[in-house]
Amino acid sequence: MQKFEFFEHTADIGIRAYGRNLNEAFENAAVAVFEVMTDTSKVEPKEMREVKIDGYDLENLLYRWIESLLVYYDSEIMLFSKFYVNIDEKNLTLEGKAWGEKFDPNKHERRTVVKAMTYHEMKIENKGNYYILTFVVDI
């Protein structure tokens, strides 16, 4: 199963992330967002950042997860390539970890900066044996 794919969206970037379970789909969504910004295969997991959030539904958890990671990019110029997510669906909480390193122009390709997460076209689908997360990021 592929981890993610991009889809056409006027002036923004649409992402479909896949996972065998909800945690893996959220992890792959994060990889996709950072793949928009750089080649994540060149981002070494040198430093770890933690994210602990709650939400009012799964879509809000997805929004807040990606938003939290973008805050690290905006404040510390951190790029991430490896993620761990544990979602408590009953209590709508997410505990996550992201590993990466600070942007280095000599090492990391500069692609399109993701400015923000959006709710536009957001959808979380449980297909039984896998999940599909669809969302759009503002560039």
Curated annotation (Swiss-Prot):
The keyword Metal-binding applies. It comes from the Archaea. Ca(2+) binds at D12, D138, I139. GO terms for molecular function: calcium ion binding. Disulfide bonds: none annotated. The keyword Metal-binding applies. Pfam families: Archease. Keywords: Calcium, Metal-binding, tRNA processing. InterPro entries: Archease (IPR002804), Archease_arc (IPR022952), Archease_dom (IPR023572), Archease_dom_sf (IPR036820). SUPFAM superfamilies: MTH1598-like. GO terms for biological process: tRNA splicing, via endonucleolytic cleavage and ligation. Activates the tRNA-splicing ligase complex by facilitating the enzymatic turnover of catalytic subunit RtcB. Acts by promoting the guanylylation of RtcB, a key intermediate step in tRNA ligation. Can also alter the NTP specificity of RtcB such that ATP, dGTP or ITP is used efficiently. Belongs to the archease family. This is Protein archease. It comes from Sulfurisphaera tokodaii (strain DSM 16993 / JCM 10545 / NBRC 100140 / 7) (Sulfolobus tokodaii).
